[in-house]
Amino acid sequence: MGDAVLVAIANVLAANLRDGDVLARWGGEEFLALMPYCPLEAACATAERIRAAIAQAPLDVGQAPIALTMSFGVTQVRSTEDLHTAIARADKALYQSKNAGRDQVSVA
């Protein structure tokens, strides 16, 4: 069932990203979306739209529908940093969301 949930989530994520955005599984239950040339405000709005879509529609993965929540960490790569540093900041923001009760978007 776990793989079916990941596939269902990935489908919601992909449906809300733009052509040219990159979606990857990052760790066990995390995803990473790279959104080139996307202003921070638009990236936050996309994360919020995905969060709401997951929260409002229980996923049907073959058994009883499963209610899920998603937490997000959003950041923008600064001109003075590499991608790894930006990802680390997004990860910190993700854990801010999780520690603040989950099911929210935090910005780094």
Which residues does each PLM region occupy?
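PAS and PAS-like sensory/regulatory domains
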Residues: L68-M70
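A short glycine-centered flexible hinge/capping loop motif at secondary-structure junctions
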Residues: G2, G27-G28, G62-Q63, G101-R102
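Alpha-helical scaffold within the catalytic cores of cyclic-nucleotide enzymes
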Residues: A10-N11, A42-P58, R89
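A short pre-motif secondary-structure segment
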Residues: V22-R25, I66
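Short catalytic/binding micro-motifs of nucleotide second-messenger systems
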Residues: A15-G20, A52-A64, L94-Q96
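Residue-level recognition of strand-loop junctions within catalytic nucleotide-signaling folds
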Residues: M35-P39, A55, V77-R78
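Active-site-proximal alpha-helical element of nucleotidyl cyclase-like catalytic domains
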Residues: M1-V22, E30, P36, I54
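Catalytic-core segments of nucleotide cyclases and related cyclic-nucleotide turnover enzymes
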Residues: C44, G62, Q76-S106
